[in-house]
Amino acid sequence: MRRNTIDIITLGCSKNLVDSEKLMRQLEANGYKVTHDSPNPQGEIAVINTCGFIGDAKEESINMILEFCEAKEEGRLKKLYVMGCLSERYLKELEVEIPQVDKFYGKFNWNELLADLGKEFHDEMAIERTLTTPKHYAYLKISEGCDRSCAYCAIPIITGKHTSRPMEEIIDEVKLLVSQGVKEFQIIAQELTYYGVDLYKSQKLPELIEKIAQVPGVEWIRLHYAYPTHFPEDLFRVMRENDNVCKYMDIALQHISDNMLTRMRRNVSKSETYELIEKFRREVPGIHLRTTLMVGFPGETEEDFEELKEFVQKARFDRMGAFAYSEEEGTYAAENYEDSIPQEVKQVRLDELMALQQEISADLSHNKIGQEFKVIIDRKEGEYYIGRTQFDSPEVDPEVLIKADGKRLFSGRFYQVRITNADDFDLFGEII
């Protein structure tokens, strides 16, 4: 056990990661040595930043807390603190059921941890972070919460109403991160397209992205977690006119059947969804679309699922994730629908859908053979340098593998690469 050392463990999404990075900076400013997701944590204090989105995530968070409780009981840890979405939602229950934790914090009051440690929260450092990502890219959170009322989703229950960050504050953070070597920004929010409505009374995402694109040193901007209803179409122009805005959009569509979209309370129709996809590809030639789909939502019939498969085949998404519905207490679906589809049926549908997408992804990847792309290098693994094109977000999308062959490439630098081969997941290339 190392004195004056704190281990931070982050579970869940990139939005949680940003919170952990801000906490780390505050702790370091108060004289602590801080590690993040260490495979061998040895600090005298641990802070677990939890996820409470779906059942599997909650289970992972509970298991991690119990693992550190055991370390505390064995004398390998002095203090254990828990923050994030799980404790935001289940604070009272957790305090009763896991008394070994010294204190639980919600998602928005983790700054109180500093006071409980007898330290100071530095307001003047509110936008500063200790990056846990490679130093050339960062996640940039532009808002919290969500005003949508999707039937299956617990996020609004956990994080509350949509709250946009002031544009000036975001730009200041971008400039600070650029000064520290960041070139690539993953723009994240629970719901990107609503940005600005609460602060400025209108959608301001296109204006914000254009301002970020104009900051010297910003090489790539990539957009995550958009919503299809009332999509701000001026964003198409921003993507066309600014080379550093990646031709990439992560937009969760969930389903295509009008029956399912209505039951999910998505406020969008099948025809509107197809129209939006066509508009993306018409207005931003070459754009790569990532989406997320759901199977097994209450009331999903075989006909609904067949429509979904047909949609995947027709839309040919460049990137796609999918998951099986799990009932979340407090949501509209949990209170109004019976979770009647057997788990084995959900799994069969999920496997079938992902098998379809794997064929499409492999086909699209093989179509890139012979083409040339600008690639940023993330790291070296064994005999290969690992990089990404503008169409690939870290952690979730395919990578480009470049054989070292005695060459020395540098993490965070861009290279022109010709694609020479592809497998079901990744591309292989050579430096031009």
Segments (PLM) and residue ranges:
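Proteins enriched for Cys/Gly/acidic motifs involved in redox and nucleic-acid/cofactor modification
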Residues: 1-195, 234, 249, 271-282, ...
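Active-site proximal loops enriched in glycine and acidic residues that flank catalytic Cys/His/Asp
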Residues: 189, 225, 253-255, 291-295, ...
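Terminal RNA-binding accessory module
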Residues: 333-432
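Conserved SAM/AdoMet-binding glycine-rich loop
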Residues: 78-84, 89, 94, 179-303, ...
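Glycine-centered loop/turn positions within well-structured domains
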Residues: 111, 148, 193, 258-259, ...
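Short acidic/polar active-site loop segments enriched in Thr and Asp
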Residues: 102, 183, 219, 318, ...
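Extended hydrophobic-aromatic, low-complexity segments
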Residues: 247-248, 261-262, 285-288, 303-305, ...
